[in-house]
Amino acid sequence: MDPAKIWWHSCLLSHKSWCNCTEPRNHLPGWPTSEGTSTEDGDIITDAEMLTLAEDTEG
């Protein structure tokens, strides 16, 4: 099994929910959290911010 999937599974087990982990440093980049999407820096980008970024890139 992919190490990332093993990690994600352990996160699932510890939090009992698919996206209930609020610790950004516990998330691999691009994976959803209860707050938004984690980045490589361990920051959280909310869905609204993601939309803004997408619009900025397209425009």
From Swiss-Prot:
Superkingdom of the source species: Viruses
Protein name: Uncharacterized ORF2 protein
The organism of origin for this protein: Torque teno tupaia virus (isolate Tbc-TTV14)
Lineage summary: Viruses, Viruses incertae sedis, Anelloviridae, Deltatorquevirus, Deltatorquevirus tupai1
